[in-house]
Amino acid sequence: MAVDFSMRQLLEAGAHFGHQSHRWNPKMQPYIFGTRNNIHIIDLAQTVPALHAALQAVSDTVARGGRVLFVGTKRQAADSIAEAAKRSAQYYVNSRWLGGMLTNWKTISGSIQRLRKVDETLEGGAVGLTKKERLMLTREKDKLEKALGGIKDMGGVPDLLFVIDTNKEQLAIKEAQRLGIPVAAIVDTNCNPDGISYIVPANDDAGRAIALYCDLIARAAIEGIGRGQGALGLDVGASEEPTAEELPPANDDVAVSVASDAIAPADVAALAESTEHFEQLAAPRGAPDDLTKLNGVGPQLVQKLNDAGVWHYWQIAAMQPEDVAKLDADLKLNGRFARDGWVEQSRAFVEASAA
C-alpha cells in the first residue's frame, strides 16, 4: 500500500512557504505559484505528485534490498532525520558531512572500524588504561559517534539519498552525483534543482514541515521492507521482530489543489499559521507583527526576539511554559515573558485578528 498524505497536511505544516522573493533561485520559477507579502508561495499542486514520486523511489529502493541515506545537518532537521532513519532501519548523517563520505568510502570504513574498536574497549571496562586514557578514549568515541554513528552499520555506499536543504548539503549531493547515486531532495525557492533526481519543491526550514517529510520517507522505507520480505516469501508474522506497520490516519483528508476554489490563495498563510506548537523561524512569514505592542517591548527587544526566530504573535501565543523558560533564559530576559504577560497578550492579539 502506498504511503498516503494530503495537500492539507502540507499546507498546515507550512510546506508552501518559500523564501523572500529577492532571495530566490530563478531555476525554481516553474514551481512557484505566486508571491504574497514578498514571500514566494510554492505550487503544492506540483509538490504533491513530486513527493509521491520520491516516496515511491524510496519504497522501491528498500524493497529490492537497497540502502537509503537520510542527510540533514541543519539544526531544525537533525533530530527528525535521525529519528526517521532509525525508525525505518536506514542510515543518516545529521551532524556534519565529512568530505569523501561517499567518494572515499575506504577511508570512512577505516574510521568506522576505529569507532567499533573504541566501543569494544570501553564496553570491556577499558582494563589497563589510566583514568586520563579512558577519558581521551571516551572523547574520541563521542566525536566518532557524532560524525559516523548514523552510517556505522551501512556496510557500503547507499543506493539513494534523501536530502533536506540542497544548499547546505551541496557536498553530499555532488558526491552522490559523481557516483551515480540518485538523490531525492526537498528543494526550496532559494535552491538550485539541477542534478536532483527527485525534486520535491517545498519549504526546507519549518520544523513541522521537515518532521512531516521525514515521517513520510520513513513510512515509505518501512513499506519497502515489507514488500521486500513478501517478495522473498518470508512469514513476517512468524518473525521474532516483525517489521513495524504504519497505521492509516484516522481521518484521510482529501487532497486539494492550491489552484482550485477549495482553498483561496489568501487563506494559504492563515492555514499554516494555525500551529499548536512553538516554532522559531529563519524569516518572517509575510510581514512581521508589531511586537512593540507587547508590554514593555521596544525596538531593541524586538531585534532580540527576531534574532531568536520570533516575528509573529501567533508564535508567542503557541508557547508552552517550557518554551517560555528556554527563550527567556536564552535571551536573558529575567522572567519578563511571564511577568509582563506576553503570551496572554499575544493570544489576545491573535484572537482579535481572527474575529
Swiss-Prot record:
Gene Ontology terms for molecular function: structural constituent of ribosome
SUPFAM superfamilies: Ribosomal protein S2 (SSF52313)
One family name in Pfam for this protein: Ribosomal_S2
Domain of life assignment: Bacteria
Keyword Methyltransferase in annotation: no
One GO CC term on file: cytosolic small ribosomal subunit
GO biological process, one term: translation
Keywords: Ribonucleoprotein, Ribosomal protein
CDD domains documented for this protein: RPS2
Assigned protein family: Belongs to the universal ribosomal protein uS2 family.
HAMAP family: Ribosomal_uS2_B
Entry protein name: Small ribosomal subunit protein uS2
Species in which this protein is naturally found: Methylorubrum extorquens (strain PA1)
